[in-house]
């Protein structure tokens, strides 16, 4: 049967697709500008929330929870968000969740005014902002779900190889699956190889194999966004 959990997932998926639909009414030059916006321009950009609701109002059959999420995904736990400065539990649950997802997506995607950040760094910033920008319990659940090194993270292993995380294992979050891209000398592999750290515990020299660190997108000339497009 179609459970409440399935319904919630459907709402979040649809809200994720539609939350910024109002930006189609924002002047493109404002969205692509690398420098800051003046107050009037900021008001215009922030109006995308109401513009999105106006567009979706013409779409019959959308769950009210989806509209709530679209309306409130820029609200923040401490009241510093927009458009209405809602605080805490006054923000609908799906809006609170979408706020976390939207923040994470913004930090890990290349933008005109900022380079994409490593997923690990974005997760840490979300954690530091818990109970200020976002509800603590939801942030911690998001991190638990994604793992310390979320899928899409570019990482270096203890033996020097570099890869992109493709899957995080629920019971072994520090031992993900990867697509290996570079060898120990940071040279591109002729063919990409899969590695499941959940079953591979040692490197070629018999030493413990671990994730050494998270790397920024573009490190060592690797564009992991391009990889997923390919």
Which role fits each region the language model picked out?
Residues 1-230:
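Histidine- and acidic-residue-rich, metal-dependent catalytic cores
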């Amino acid at each position: 049967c179609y459970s409440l959990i399935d319904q919630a997932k459907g709402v979040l998926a649809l809200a994720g697709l539609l939350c910024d639909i109002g930006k189609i009414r924002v002047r493109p030059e404002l969205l692509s500008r690398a420098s800051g916006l003046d107050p009037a321009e900021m008001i215009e950009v922030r109006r995308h929330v109401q513009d999105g609701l106006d567009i979706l109002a013409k779409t019959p059959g959308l769950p009210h929870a989806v509209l709530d999420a679209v309306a409130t995904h820029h609200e923040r736990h401490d009241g510093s968000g927009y458009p209405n400065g809602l605080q805490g539990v006054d923000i609908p649950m799906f809006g609170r969740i979408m706020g976390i997802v939207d923040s994470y997506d913004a930090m890990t995607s290349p933008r005109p005014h900022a380079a994409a950040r490593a997923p690990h760094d974005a997760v840490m910033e979300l954690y530091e902002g818990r109970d200020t920008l976002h509800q603590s319990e939801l942030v911690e659940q998001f991190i638990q779900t994604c793992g310390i090194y979320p899928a899409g993270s570019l990482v270096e292993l203890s033996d020097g190889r570099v890869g992109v995380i493709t899957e995080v294992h629920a019971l072994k979050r520090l031992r993900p699956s990867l697509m290996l891209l570079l060898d120990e000398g940071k040279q591109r592999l002729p063919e990409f190889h899969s590695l499941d750290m959940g079953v591979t515990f040692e490197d070629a020299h018999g030493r413990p194999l671990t994730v050494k660190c998270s790397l920024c997108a573009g490190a060592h000339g690797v564009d992991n966004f391009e990889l997923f497009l390919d």
